[in-house]
Design a protein with these regions (language model features):
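Glycine-rich beta-alpha loop elements in corrinoid/cobalamin-binding modules
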Residues: 6, 28-166
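A structural signal for short coil/turn segments at secondary-structure junctions
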Residues: 2, 36, 61-62, 91, ...
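N-terminal [4Fe-4S]-dependent radical SAM core
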Residues: 2-3, 8, 14, 144, ...
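Residues at alpha-helix caps and immediate loop-helix transition turns in enzyme cores, especially N-
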Residues: 20-24, 51-54, 79-83, 225, ...
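Conserved beta-strand positions
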Residues: 9, 69, 98, 121, ...
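A short, glycine/small-residue-rich beta-strand->loop->alpha-helix junction that serves as a flexible
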Residues: 14-23, 72-77, 197
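Radical SAM [4Fe-4S] cluster-binding motif and immediate context
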Residues: 173-334
Length: 335
């Protein structure tokens, strides 16, 4: 086994064909690869291997230090518990690590129910490196920030890890480990070419608001630089033929200056791409809409949530019904 460690990530099956690229796992893989770690990816959701087939292909005849599974809470009982049962049967000396939006808020429950070893709470790029070093060096798990872990049927919570402030310091996702042809061609785009290769990316993390229904654990918004975003787009277009991008940001169109600077950079570099993104009605105006359209934006998603002001106030949206109407009007008029 690689002295710097060996990690397997399993992208569990969601029993559908239009699978979104697993961006979170791809970031973790990139960080580990940069450290010289051997990383393998099992894309169960793309190839629809049964748990038994997955075990034959990835677990029975191989050994790992960590086996990671990310998930949404809605998939836990239906999919993850059975998957973890299979992993535990064949994992040998590996630690079974859970992460994602499903694991972070209810780590105690998921660790006990799935009989996993560790749950990463919050962002995982720094935590996964520390966790692997802890495993291969046989160090104390209680010293690893940003995790909960199970020991003797008890769950222990360590100190929370602070979010990564400089997003440009995170390497681009490790696309080379994934079946990019499948991921880039299975999702319908809103672009002029419905068969254009499409992929998702993140230009920021977080949001300026704190709606009371939001799953986010951190406060505020952190931004990548425009140059860094443009370089990723160029790389994806050059290496994988991607021409349509879905911006996964909770709030892409903020601040206004960065949004316009991004649009200007797309135009200046003659990228000839199309994209869709999310916006808030209270920080959206006609000038922004014009630049977005010129840069290739084909679809804007506003979180209107309700046409009743009382409901918006209860949600703590900090927006008004009139702002919803005005934003929709501007977007339609600009086209």
């Amino acid at each position: 086994m690689n002295k710097k460690g060996k990690v397997l990530f399993i992208i569990h099956d969601v029993y559908q064909e239009d699978n979104e690229f697993p961006l979170g796992i791809a970031y973790l893989a990139a960080v580990l690869k940069k450290q010289g770690v051997e990383v393998k990816i099992c894309c169960q959701e793309v190839f629809h291997w049964s748990n038994k087939e997955m075990a034959e292909l990835f677990l029975k005849n191989d050994e790992y230090d960590l086996i990671g599974v990310g998930f949404l809470a809605a998939r836990f009982k239906k999919t993850i518990v059975d998957l973890c049962e299979t992993i535990n049967k064949y994992k040998k000396d590996a630690w079974l690590v859970l992460g994602g939006q499903g694991a972070s808020p209810i780590a105690d429950y998921v660790l006990k129910t799935a009989k996993a070893d560790v749950a990463i709470i919050g962002e995982g790029e720094e935590t996964i490196v520390d966790l692997l070093n802890c495993k291969i060096s046989d160090k104390d798990l209680s010293k690893v920030k940003g995790i909960a872990y199970r020991e003797d049927e008890k769950v222990f919570f360590n100190e929370r890890r602070k979010p990564i402030m400089n997003l440009d310091s995170i390497p681009f996702p490790e696309w080379s480990l994934f079946p990019m042809e499948r991921y880039s061609s299975c999702i319908y785009s809103f672009g002029s070419d419905k068969k254009a290769k499409r992929i998702g990316m993140l230009s920021s993390r977080g949001c300026i608001n704190r709606c009371n229904f939001c799953y986010r654990m951190e406060h505020g918004i952190r931004l990548r630089s425009v140059d860094n975003i443009i370089e990723e787009i160029k790389t994806l277009k050059r290496d994988y033929g991607i021409t349509y991008f879905t911006m996964y940001d909770e709030l892409f169109c903020f601040p206004k200056k960065r949004t316009i600077d991004f649009c200007k950079a797309v135009i200046k570099n003659n990228l000839n791409i199309e994209f869709d993104c999310n916006a808030r009605v209270d920080v959206f105006d006609r000038e922004t809409a014009v630049y977005l359209k010129e840069a290739g934006c084909k679809f804007l998603n506003f979180g209107f949530e309700s046409s009743d002001q009382k409901v918006l106030d209860l949600m703590k949206k900090n927006t008004t019904v009139q702002e919803n109407i005005e934003a929709a009007k501007i977007a339609n008029e600009v086209g």
